[in-house]
Amino acid sequence: MTWSDIGVNFTDKRLFFEPVFKRALTADVSHIIITGTNIDKSQQAVHLAQQYPHHLSATIGVHPHHANEFGDETLNKLQNLANSKSVVAIGECGLDFNRNFSTPDQQLFAFEQQLKLACELGLPVFLHERDAFKAQVELLTKYRKTLKGGVVHCFTGDIEQMNRYLDLDL
């Protein structure tokens, strides 16, 4: 049996890429998706995935903690990065009203822009949600008909909220 890992932070300097990647392959992990959390990390994720196209793919996006960095230039860079064959999703994106490293308004703006981009490109989303269920589900519901799908990678809710995400086919 082989395994896939859908959210590895190989762009984190604390995680030594080569030995971890080699151990993963030895442990029958056949495919890994590297998570992009801002423009720099998204560029790094794409670069790594291009080096190992049979084993690595990338997500590109802006994590809610970095939403204060999101603007027109960010959106343009994400659109350009999306041209890479290694890009399989938009994210890690979403809302985090627990830590609030970016304001809720900044997070809502960045999240909605990334949802629009995912819809335009026909890509799924890689989602993060912490203590922001209502606002996140409202935006997801707004775009769900044109959104290709996605996965809720981080969420702090209860079973009822989990079922609501499942009702959205996420």
Regions found by a protein language model. Give the residues of each.
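Mid-domain alpha/beta scaffold segments of enzyme catalytic cores
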Residues: 1-170
